[in-house]
């Protein structure tokens, strides 16, 4: 019917439903983004403060099929990944989220399903099988004993290995032939984060503000 059809059905149609409409506290919280610049890792681990920052930022890309008239990816920031439905200051929702993550000792992940080895028009999207392998590993705890490295520009932690995923895919800079171009594009995205967050800094804690990316220049 459309490029991105939605459907609904009665809850009674689900055989293993629960009648009280409640579940336990999650052990993992996953944010989904689509980075058309090709600079974000396919999987990153976030601290509660970083989770609040990225939740407020709501960075992703509009891609064909999600909105009428979109034929190629467009970078966008949608507060709390759903700006029209958040009437109060974003920090209220972000603080609630980070408190829940902290109180329940949950892990928070940022999964990127965008482009790798270059940006849109220069490369291809991350393979679905890699995204599945990373998500399954995160949810099963298979990454608990894996070495993580801190991304110098964005600050989050990135695994160095994951079964079923080439190691270089986990470090986006390693997939680009032109490392200087990668640095320039990554700095461009970092600036976009910083400029977008200016409108929210009043009322946001110093800890959350410190999760902002930094502009590094060529490394």
Where do the model's predicted regions map?
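Glycine-rich, often acidic-flanked micro-motifs
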Residues: 1-175, 192-195
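Generic C-terminus detector
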Residues: 169, 174-219
